[in-house]
Amino acid sequence: IGTSAMKMDKGGPESLLSNLVAGVLQQAAVQVLGKPADMGLVNMGGLRNILPEGDITVGDVFEILPFENSLCVLTMKGTDLRRLFEAIASLHGEGVSGIRLEITKNGKLLNAFVGEKPLKDDQLYTVATIDYLADGNGRMDAFLQAEKRVCPEDATLRGLFLDYVRKQTAEGKAITSKLDGRITIK
C-alpha cells in the first residue's frame, strides 16, 4: 500500500515511529474540529512493531497497531494539560506531535511549549489521542478532567494510519518521519 523511506522504531524520549503516528492523530482531528488538534499523543506501548524500510503492507500496519484503538479529541485547560505533560515526563517520553517538552533524566517536566508558544494555564487546548489514553489509562488520568471529549464513530487509529499511507502513496510520496527534539532531556 506504500513505501517507507526509512526503518522507523519506537522508544523514548522520542522516536521516528511514535512521532509519525502522533502526527497522524493530530491531523485526523480535522474530522472533529475542522482543523488539526494542537497536539497528538500516542503511547509507546500502543506501538507493537517497527515499520521497516521499503514496502508497507496492510499486515505491517496490523503488526504495529494490533489494538482496536479509536481517535478521541479532547479539549483541555492548560492546567490539566500541564498535568498530562508531567505524566509524559515521568514516563520519559511518549509519542507526541505539535508540542515540545524539556524534561529531566529523572522524569520531571522543565518546560512545555504548544506550537512554538509556552503552555498557558488558562488557555484551552485540543489534544488528539486514542480512547485507551483518553479513558485515563497509561498514567494519563489528566484526560479525565477534559472540558470536552469527542470520539467519532469508526475512526480507528489503524484505519487512520492506513488512510494516511494510501493518501501519501497516491500523491507519489514515501512515508517519512524525523526526530526534531520535541522531547529533550536536559
How would you name each of these model-derived features?
Residues 1-14:
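Glycine-rich phosphate/diphosphate-binding loops and the adjacent beta-loop-alpha structural elements
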